[in-house]
Amino acid sequence: MLDRIKIALQHLLPKRWLTELAGWGAERRGGWLTRGVITLFVRWYKVDMQEAQQPDVATYPTFNAFFVRPLRDEARPIDADPAVLVLPADGIISQLGPIEGEQVFQAKGHHYSLEALLAGNESMITRFRDGSFATTYLAPRDYHRVHMPCNGVLREMLYVPGELFSVNPLTAANIPNLFARNERIICLFDTDFGPMAQILVGATIVGSIETVWAGTVTPPREGIIKRWRYPQADADGAVVLLKGQEMGRFKLGSTVINLFAGKNVLLGEHLYTRYVTRVGQRLAHGIAQTDSPLT
């Protein structure tokens, strides 16, 4: 009964207004009030502040500064094997596995299509048809910077407007096409293992989504699809990111979806639904192509 009420509220609450209000409040310098809110958040969600570069909550002038806190360098070692792709975020595995034609598994009884997820971008749809995917859910207590699974050259970015449903496991199990309905940023990379998409999905109370090359992408929320193209690795203006390097961040938490093309990326057999993830740990084994797009 309680779960039904929670799902009903997802449809009834003014999600966009709540998200804008939360984003506004999270950027305010509230002095003792900000420190109090952060302290309560740390206690309620059992956040491990000893992993942070600045463990003292008094050092954070705003809630957002706390929320995107950097970790100590040694807190997330990156698997150094060049054939290993690593987990992009702290959280849990929501789902992972093969893309069956153009269908991506969301939860029991629910799939969504590549066409819907990728906003009808035919070139991307063709790349990832019959590929593989991994979906990582970031809970409020988690570290909220997103990192690269492998070396990559950014070739395209799409901003897709949409809903702002919560993306927690309960909502994923009950709202059809959730990740294809929510606001999202789609980042397409060329890698040694073929094309890879890293998709940052918005949600209720996610005040903004940022990337390291473009800064804040949303807000503003203008209701139109936006597209940016980027040059190959050896051209002026190229965006080249290395494995384990930060590529984006959420203010507050949400979901990351990775899409891999073909059969060159073999997801780790040790992974399963609700597996606890940490940045830098093994996600998959990759079979490198002959010609590297990074050279």
From Swiss-Prot:
Enzyme class, first EC level, given as a word: lyase
- Share the record's PTM remark: Is synthesized initially as an inactive proenzyme. Formation of the active enzyme involves a self-maturation process in which the active site pyruvoyl group is generated from an internal serine residue via an autocatalytic post-translational modification. Two non-identical subunits are generated from the proenzyme in this reaction, and the pyruvate is formed at the N-terminus of the alpha chain, which is derived from the carboxyl end of the proenzyme.
Q: What is its EC number?
A: 4.1.1.65
Annotated pathway, please?
A: Phospholipid metabolism; phosphatidylethanolamine biosynthesis; phosphatidylethanolamine from CDP-diacylglycerol: step 2/2
Report the cofactors: pyruvate
- Where along the chain is the active site annotated? D90 (charge relay system), H147 (charge relay system), S254 (charge relay system), S254 (schiff-base intermediate with substrate)
Membrane keyword on record = yes
**Which keywords accompany this UniProt record?**
Cell membrane, Decarboxylase, Lipid biosynthesis, Lipid metabolism, Lyase, Membrane, Phospholipid biosynthesis, Phospholipid metabolism, Pyruvate, Zymogen
Can you quote a single GO CC term?
A: plasma membrane
Membrane topology type, per the record? Peripheral membrane protein
Pfam families for this protein = PS_Dcarbxylase
Main localization is membrane
The record's note on quaternary structure and interaction partners says: Heterodimer of a large membrane-associated beta subunit and a small pyruvoyl-containing alpha subunit.
What this chain does, per the entry, is described as:
Catalyzes the formation of phosphatidylethanolamine (PtdEtn) from phosphatidylserine (PtdSer).
The record ties this protein, via HAMAP family, to: PS_decarb_PSD_B_type1
Q: What is the name attached to this protein's record?
A: Phosphatidylserine decarboxylase proenzyme
